[in-house]
């Protein structure tokens, strides 16, 4: 058994892997796991190739804008940033404190991402391949609170995850080793805007609201430019379905035939019979983003020549959201279907 493991270390040193050059969670997960294995099992070899693992971690961080938003969604923040954190902790100890990957302004902003994703109770922002209801990893959250102090606001402990997804040992063991007792703070009446990701978040005493621009070529992308979520009393009222069932077909060229990834499964209009298109070139233009209003042009998501502008404006009040869509279309054809997604059956009053 040891001989087989020994051969794997030298095999790794002679070969480059695709996940070393990706700007998503996979770089941190794979690089972090392999890097920690080298530190624990072959620290002598780690001293020779440590820069390789640092480069992998920097590739991961390059997938974030300076605002710290994880365009892949909260679930992949937990996955990717979790393993980045675990590696950073072990590597800091390995270097005797000389290299601290967490001592960085951008990394601090990334660490704050989780606390901004809770809208009402554990009804969360489920953009991209994420879940409508969030359960946080207690160990990594408490560690970040200890490290960054008041900059980190832990969610309510009743929403902590006691059974890590896929039985991931790294999350599980740290939920015991790093567990601490921190008070959850109320985030009512809060406003967050991520300018790079173009995510808008408004939390009030009565409800939580989120909307997004961005582009349709993001990692774990959904065609969802202009989509929004309204959460109330712990439930998404206007919903983002979130991730679909993971199959090979879901990650193939057929991805946008699924309702949850297509714009047909999001609260955005159908214009002249067309849904939004996928690709980084299909994007939004932000017009205004402040505490009371979020306004953007989503026409670029459709790639329709005669559609000159689709100005979507959200006005946020204490107990109301007013949505106004303004269409500028050339030619005689102007067929608009407004589409709203909810998992709650409407009732006539």
Residue ranges and their predicted role:
Residues 28, 47-54, 71-74, 78-85, ...:
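Conserved structured core elements
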